[in-house]
Amino acid sequence: MSYDRSTAEAVIQLYLDGLYECDADKLGQAFHPSADLRWHEKGELNVLSYADWLERVRQRTSPKSQGHPRHDFVVTVDRSDETTAFVKVKCALPPRFFTDYLVLMKLNSGWQVVSKSYRYETHD
């Protein structure tokens, strides 16, 4: 299936929908294949490849299927030019609530996430 990647906003929505639905196909369209995910835990930097992350997504039960309400929204979009955007979003995979920092670039095939760094808190 082909998804809209004509704008950074469309890719952000695709990303948020993919997370809420645990839809690896949507997330795969939002991310560039060379992207990775980075987070800090116990004083250490952790790095996960895009392919390994999608495999984890495929194993999850989605918040949507569990009847959880959506907790996702865009906090900021900062564009340095017509081809690069830095986006901060809030989202949830209960009981974890995330702040994601996404770098998007407009490539020949459209906008894609090329890097993701995040932090999360656990709530009961």
Place the predicted regions along the sequence by residue.
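Surface-exposed, charged secondary-structure patches
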Residues: 4-10, 36-97
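A contiguous, well-structured "functional interface" segment within a domain
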Residues: 1-7, 64, 115-122
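Short secondary-structure capping/turn micro-motifs that flank functional sites
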Residues: 35-36, 122
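Short beta-strand edge/turn micro-motifs at domain boundaries
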Residues: 97-124
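Short, low-complexity N-terminal intrinsically disordered segments enriched in polar/charged residues
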Residues: 1-33, 48-51
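Short beta-strand segments enriched in hydrophobic/aromatic residues
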Residues: 31, 91, 117-118
